């Protein structure tokens, strides 16, 4: 388990682009993390003022940050910078709204050198909001 201060020590992202609030579980190949979505998120000012919905690309970014935590927790990658290298088969199935808690689960399915591949799923109340495959490069 990691709190926000421990997450900030691992990820280079800072406000307003840090999209992981807590890590519940972390192993060599899997991470389960959470993002508490509030009406105070800066992106809700423009997406959309009368019907606030978390942008899908930011859900994918939150998944990428969770996956990066799993990779950067490995001894050989500590202190390195994670880069989002690609996405595939991403689907959005449920809107994420203010007040939702986004559960972010990423399983690292392959690691070749400094390139990692993960299966990612974001859920709200047990229902899939977004799923897909993500690719990381560690610099």
Swiss-Prot record:
Q: Name one GO biological process term.
A: lipid A biosynthetic process
Question: What's this protein's family per the entry?
Answer: Belongs to the thioester dehydratase family. FabZ subfamily.
* Reaction it catalyzes: a (3R)-hydroxyacyl-[ACP] = a (2E)-enoyl-[ACP] + H2O
| Sorted UniProt keywords | Cytoplasm, Lipid A biosynthesis, Lipid biosynthesis, Lipid metabolism, Lyase
* SUPFAM superfamilies listed in its UniProt record: Thioesterase/thiol ester dehydrase-isomerase
Recorded GO molecular functions are: (3R)-hydroxyacyl-[acyl-carrier-protein] dehydratase activity
Which gene is transcribed and translated to give this protein? fabZ
* Class of enzymatic activity (EC top level): lyase
Tell where it localizes: Cytoplasm
Any keyword Metal-binding? no
Enumerate the PANTHER family for this protein. Answer: 3-HYDROXYACYL-[ACYL-CARRIER-PROTEIN] DEHYDRATASE
Q: Where is the active site?
A: 47
Which protein is depicted? 3-hydroxyacyl-[acyl-carrier-protein] dehydratase FabZ
**What domain of life?**
Bacteria
Q: Which organism is it from?
A: Clostridium perfringens (strain 13 / Type A)
Q: Please give an example of a GO cellular component term from this record.
A: cytoplasm
Output the Gene3D superfamilies linked to this UniProt entry: Hotdog Thioesterase
Q: What is the lineage of its organism?
A: Bacteria, Bacillati, Bacillota, Clostridia, Eubacteriales
**EC id:** 4.2.1.59
**Function summary:** Involved in unsaturated fatty acids biosynthesis. Catalyzes the dehydration of short chain beta-hydroxyacyl-ACPs and long chain saturated and unsaturated beta-hydroxyacyl-ACPs.
């Amino acid at each position: 388990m990691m709190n926000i201060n421990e997450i900030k020590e691992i990820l280079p992202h800072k406000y307003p682009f840090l999209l992981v609030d807590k890590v519940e579980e972390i192993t060599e190949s899997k991470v389960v993390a959470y993002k508490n979505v509030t009406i105070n998120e800066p992106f809700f000012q423009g997406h959309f003022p009368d019907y606030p919905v978390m942008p899908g690309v930011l859900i994918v970014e939150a998944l990428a940050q969770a996956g990066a935590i799993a990779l950067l927790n490995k001894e050989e990658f500590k202190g390195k910078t994670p880069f989002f290298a690609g996405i595939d088969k991403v689907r959005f199935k449920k809107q994420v709204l203010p007040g939702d808690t986004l559960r972010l689960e990423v399983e690292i399915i392959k690691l070749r050198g400094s390139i990692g591949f993960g299966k990612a799923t974001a859920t709200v109340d047990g229902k899939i909001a977004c799923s897909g495959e993500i690719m990381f490069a560690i610099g």
